[in-house]
Design a protein with these regions (language model features):
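C-terminal transmembrane bundle of multi-pass solute transporters/carriers
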Residues: 2, 17, 23-187
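Juxtamembrane cytosolic amphipathic helices that cap and anchor the N-termini
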Residues: 1-12, 90
Length: 187
């Protein structure tokens, strides 16, 4: 089960990293934004992450970690997809969806970290985190290398839409993998 969680996490990272790299271009090209608006989007995304982390820390939802992770994947994917199909006049909506993306990230990263901490023996935890970080970065690097070419070929907004769909599908798929959904029931 934990192996599948890590595979899903690597896939999500593969599709999210190009979006992170393209945020400034999306603002400049699709929304004819200014340097100030590029900064604003980055700020709003970061504020969303901060607020999401605070909310997760205060709220402490009574939802299974894998469910929270999968739901956050779907929310992130939907908000990225919608950002990709917004008309150029919808900068304010784009800014709002940037906050939503940021808000959803702690609801993935927090439960993922906690899940690893509860399922892996403490003496191996550092090595597992190091290995996972290295493994998840490899496909991200490949995705980032191809991002510029793909964005030039099909447009930045289309990359957002396609990556958003891929994230939604990956997050939804995780709900149908029994070893993931039963992971917290195994004790």
């Amino acid at each position: 089960g934990l192996s599948w969680v890590m595979v899903i996490e690597v896939l999500i990272t593969f599709f999210v990293m190009p979006i992170v790299a393209l945020l400034p271009l999306m603002t400049l090209k699709n929304f004819s934004g200014t340097a100030y608006q590029v900064s604003l989007i980055e700020l709003l995304f970061g504020l969303g992450m901060l607020l999401g982390g605070i909310l997760l820390g205060i709220w402490n939802p009574r939802v299974r970690k894998v469910v929270m992770m999968n739901v956050s994947y779907v929310i992130i994917g939907i908000s990225i997809f919608i950002s990709g199909i917004l008309p150029p006049s919808a900068f304010i909506a784009y800014a709002i969806f940037s906050v939503v993306q940021g808000l959803a990230i702690p609801f993935n990263s927090g439960p993922f970290t906690a899940l690893l901490q509860t399922k892996i023996e403490a003496s191996f935890l550092g090595r597992v985190f190091s290995l996972f970080d290295s493994i998840s970065l490899l496909p991200s690097i490949l995705g980032l290398m191809a991002t510029g070419f793909i964005a030039d070929a099909i447009g930045v907004a289309n990359v957002f839409a396609i990556c958003g769909i891929a994230i939604v599908l990956t997050g939804t798929l995780a709900f149908f993998i029994p070893s993931i959904m039963n992971l917290e029931r195994e004790e």
